[in-house]
UniProtKB/Swiss-Prot annotation:
Its cofactor is Mg(2+). It comes from the Bacteria. One of its GO terms (molecular function) is rRNA binding. It is an enzyme of class 3 (hydrolase). The keyword DNA repair does not apply. It is found in: Cytoplasm. Its EC number is 3.1.26.3. Keywords: Cytoplasm, Endonuclease, Hydrolase, Magnesium, Metal-binding, mRNA processing, Nuclease, RNA-binding, rRNA processing, rRNA-binding, tRNA processing. Pfam families: dsrm, Ribonucleas_3_3. The active site is at residues 47, 119. The gene is rnc. It comes from Nitratidesulfovibrio vulgaris (strain DSM 19637 / Miyazaki F). Homodimer. This is Ribonuclease 3.
Length: 230
């Protein structure tokens, strides 16, 4: 069930059970008759891994930046709202294992649960593959979010940035298509497919068409920027 997620983060787990644990909330574990490990310990580990990876990357990217500037940039990148947004871009809500009560109270959309799951996932990557693999995953999933300057400024308009990049690389624009919608009227989810000029396809599901398009554009940006890094 985690094939797409592993593809999105560019990492295939040797022990898929670690990823399953990373997506397991304590509410789900508490409902099981047998002992099941939840993601809080992995979250603790992933928080430290993320902070180190981001610190190392910022240190390398901005050799002239002062300590205060680096601290502010790191704080923006690893803040709970930023991590929740990143988790939504990866559609982690689709993989969470939640207890019935948490599910009924909208836990799948709760930012705190999503940011915790993202940190737990990074902790799982670290345990499964070591620091270098965890660092590669962090660099990949944050590819569209690294600051452009020491003030930490970076546009969040992924569609505009993607269009500029594809025009430069392919002299063509990406194509967006609405594939459908689901859910009740007050909680509709929209699926968008984005096709790059080279035929690479990305899909995203969001609470609005515009949001889904931005999410798909963010995934495409990460892909193109990781190609240039490689």
């Amino acid at each position: 069930m985690f094939e797409k997620l592993q593809s999105d983060i560019h990492y295939a787990f040797n022990d898929a059970g670690l990823l399953a644990t990373a997506m397991t909330h304590s509410s789900w574990a508490n409902e099981q008759q047998e002992h099941v490990e939840h993601n809080e310990r992995l979250e603790f580990l992933g928080d430290a891994v993320l902070e180190l990876c981001v610190s190392e990357e910022l240190f390398a990217r901005f050799p002239g930046a002062r300590e205060g500037d680096l601290t502010r940039m790191r704080a923006r990148l690893v803040s709970k709202p930023a991590l929740a947004e990143l988790a939504r871009d990866l559609q982690l809500e689709l993989y969470l294992r939640l207890g019935r009560g948490e599910e009924s109270q909208g836990g799948r959309e709760r930012s705190s649960l999503l940011s915790d799951a993202l940190e737990a996932m990074l902790g799982a990557v670290f345990l499964d593959g070591g620091y270098e693999r965890a660092r590669a995953v962090v660099r990949h999933v944050l590819a569209a979010r690294w600051p452009c300057d020491a003030d930490g400024k970076r546009s969040k308009d992924y569609k505009s940035r993607l269009q500029e990049l594809t025009q430069s690389l392919f002299r063509e624009r990406p194509v967006y298509a609405l594939m459908g919608s689901s859910g009740p009227e007050h909680e509709k989810r929209f699926e968008v497919r984005l096709t790059l000029p080279d035929g690479t396809v990305f899909t995203a599901i969001g609470p609005s068409v515009k949001r889904a398009e931005q999410m798909a554009a963010g995934l495409a940006l990460k892909n193109l920027e990781s190609r240039s890094d490689g």
